[in-house]
Amino acid sequence: MRSSGRKKEQIRPVKITRNFTKYAEGSVLIEVGDTKVLCTASIEEKVPPFLKGSGEGWITAEYNMIPRSTQSRKQRDINKLKIDGRTMEIQRLIGRALRSAVDMKALGEKTIWIDCDVLQADGGTRTTSITGSFVALVDAVNKLHQKKPFNVYPIRHFVSAVSIGIVGEEKVLDLCYEEDHVAKVDMNVVMIEEGEFIEIQGTGEIGPFSRKELDELLNLAEKGAKQMIQAQKNALKTDSLWIGTGRE
């Protein structure tokens, strides 16, 4: 039994609040345990120069932690005059994860900006950002679809992300900060509903880990990703019916 009382395969409570802010086409507050992230999706009727005239859209992401989202104040990136390596890595991960869910040709020449602002961090901020941003993305795309229906609905499948790791000798799902900072192995996994992988990030923090342990962790991740997708479906309700249909 973990210090939180959870079983090893149990995720933290998930709460997804849609339309959390007024102006963005999609906005979500996602809470996974004590981790809270505001995710917004904003639409621009243009694409980066390398896509002009291609007929394809683009999805890009920015990630930020507000100064007191952590136990001690974190300096804003703007005050350091550069984005730190961790932030850059995470926002690229979020962008890749969401682009993999979307038919860019069907989207057309539009850019969807995903902004993730961590309000409170207690482990799993990057995975929580992906899971919440997907819901914000669906809301934004649905608003486009309602204004002018797509010939082919561009979102192809659900995407979610979870963390897994080895703490002590136990393989556990959805690590909180207390577990994350002592984990022997720390992994983040992004998956689609059909059980296929988008990204696997894994590190032996103390030493190497075996193929058998890797397989066990990935099995655990699949269970967690399915639970996260169910939370997304519960939040979206009937607004998710177009996903994966490719229909008008």
Swiss-Prot record:
Name the positions where phosphate binds.
86, 124-126
InterPro entries associated with the record: ExoRNase_PH_dom1, ExoRNase_PH_dom2, ExoRNase_PH_dom2_sf, PNPase/RNase_PH_dom_sf, Ribosomal_Su5_D2-typ_SF, RNase_PH, RNase_PH_bac-type, RNase_PH_CS
Q: Can you supply a Gene Ontology BP term from the record?
A: rRNA processing
The EC number(s) attached to this protein equal 2.7.7.56
Checking Pfam families in the record gives: RNase_PH, RNase_PH_C
Looking at the keywords, is Transferase present? Answer: yes
Its recorded reaction(s) are:
tRNA(n+1) + phosphate = tRNA(n) + a ribonucleoside 5'-diphosphate
- EC main class here is transferase
Query: Which keywords label this protein?
Result: Nucleotidyltransferase, RNA-binding, rRNA processing, Transferase, tRNA processing, tRNA-binding
UniProt cross-references to PROSITE patterns, sorted A to Z: RIBONUCLEASE_PH
A molecular-function term among this protein's GO annotations: 3'-5'-RNA exonuclease activity
Q: Does the keyword Metal-binding apply?
A: no
Q: Which HAMAP family match?
A: RNase_PH
Q: What does this protein do?
A: Phosphorolytic 3'-5' exoribonuclease that plays an important role in tRNA 3'-end maturation. Removes nucleotide residues following the 3'-CCA terminus of tRNAs; can also add nucleotides to the ends of RNA molecules by using nucleoside diphosphates as substrates, but this may not be physiologically important. Probably plays a role in initiation of 16S rRNA degradation (leading to ribosome degradation) during starvation.
Q: Provide the assembly information.
A: Homohexameric ring arranged as a trimer of dimers.
**The family this protein is said to belong to:** Belongs to the RNase PH family.
Q: What is this protein called?
A: Ribonuclease PH
